[in-house]
């Protein structure tokens, strides 16, 4: 796999069409074991920034994309997908279910502490794990070291992107959120016995990209070794842009000022009907490369 991609890059100097095609062929041929996880999959973190006119689909994670294509393939073949994929496809095809080995669904981790905010450092780690699962066989495990007692740990997903989120956007993506006021966030959380905390609460939250305000749902006390089902029904709202949703964990250790934090999340999804109003005066002009301009939350094609 590695050598084939290297040859494709060096011979053609075209890393999207040529190498994208041969990497697909070689990936199917060799399977996951042929792909170096640390080199290729971990940096990508399951995130695909697409460039279609459908803004909510441009923020795509690889498991969702894989099941989206799989659903179409089985429909064209007139066949029924096997379980557990049929249930996932029929219920919440875009859910963060973590059943694909190594999948992260483009989830991230951050904390309130500025010194720990840089994801990818030795202090913060996420990984797909078969150690615990709410349903199925896998979940997402997060570990944060040196967490100050009483601070928040956020395990989250970006639901909308803007130009400032990119260092290279030459393919001119455009985005609209895939969650709106009126809908409900669902998620499941688990704290293992070995997590170094005396008391932990967990809840769900969302971030308004316009005001910068964070809205929190009700938190629950976590019992180590038990899954907790969480939900947050977002009320009707006006003039907001929900660009981030996730879990918020707060842990206290009475013996240490800082400790190691470990937990799992699973079955993270959105349902319900949007209920919101929007005044275009609150919109922002997004400036992409060249002459490409978009109105925040909206996408268009040749003026439409």
Regions found by a protein language model. Name each.
Residues 144-146, 156-181, 233-239, 304:
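Extracellular and analogous surface-interaction loops
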Residues 136-137, 150, 182, 223-227:
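Solvent-exposed, conformationally flexible loop/turn segments
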Residues 76-101, 257, 269-303:
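Activation corresponds to long, low-complexity, non-globular regions
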Residues 1-71, 75, 190:
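Catalytic phosphate/nucleotide-handling subdomain of diverse soluble enzymes
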Residues 124-165, 292-304:
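Short carbohydrate-recognition loop motifs
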Residues 164-168, 178, 186-236, 261:
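Extracellular ligand-binding interfaces
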Residues 55-150:
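Catalytic cores of secreted or luminal carbohydrate-active enzymes
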Residues 187, 229-268, 280, 304:
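Extracellular beta-strand ligand-recognition surfaces/modules
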């Amino acid at each position: 796999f590695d050598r084939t991609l290297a040859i494709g890059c060096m011979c053609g100097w075209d890393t999207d069409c040529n190498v994208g095609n041969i990497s697909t062929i070689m990936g199917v041929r060799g399977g996951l074991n042929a792909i170096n996880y640390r080199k290729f999959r971990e940096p990508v973190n399951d995130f695909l920034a697409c460039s279609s006119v459908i803004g909510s689909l441009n923020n795509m994670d690889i498991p969702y994309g894989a099941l989206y294509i799989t659903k179409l393939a089985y429909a064209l073949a007139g066949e029924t997908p096997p379980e557990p994929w049929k249930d996932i496809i029929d219920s919440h095809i875009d859910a963060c279910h973590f059943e694909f080995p190594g999948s992260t669904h483009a989830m991230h981790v951050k904390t309130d502490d500025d010194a720990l905010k840089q994801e990818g450092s030795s202090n913060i780690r996420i990984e797909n794990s078969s150690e615990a699962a709410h349903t199925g066989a896998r979940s997402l495990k997060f570990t944060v070291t040196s967490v100050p007692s009483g601070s928040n740990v956020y395990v989250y997903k970006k639901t909308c992107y803007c130009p400032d989120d990119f260092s290279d956007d030459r393919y001119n993506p455009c985005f609209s959120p895939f969650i709106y006021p009126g809908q409900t966030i669902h998620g499941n959380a688990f704290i293992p016995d070995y997590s170094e905390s005396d008391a932990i609460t967990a809840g769900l939250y969302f971030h308004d990209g316009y005001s910068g305000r964070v809205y929190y749902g009700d938190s629950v006390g976590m019992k180590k070794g038990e899954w907790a089902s969480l939900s947050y029904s977002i009320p009707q709202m006006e003039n907001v842009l929900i660009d981030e949703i996730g879990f918020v964990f707060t842990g206290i250790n009475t013996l240490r000022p800082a400790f190691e934090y470990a937990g799992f999340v699973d079955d993270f999804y959105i349902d319900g009907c949007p209920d919101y109003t929007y005044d275009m005066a609150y919109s922002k002009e997004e400036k992409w490369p060249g002459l490409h301009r978009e109105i925040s939350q909206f996408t268009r094609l040749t003026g439409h």
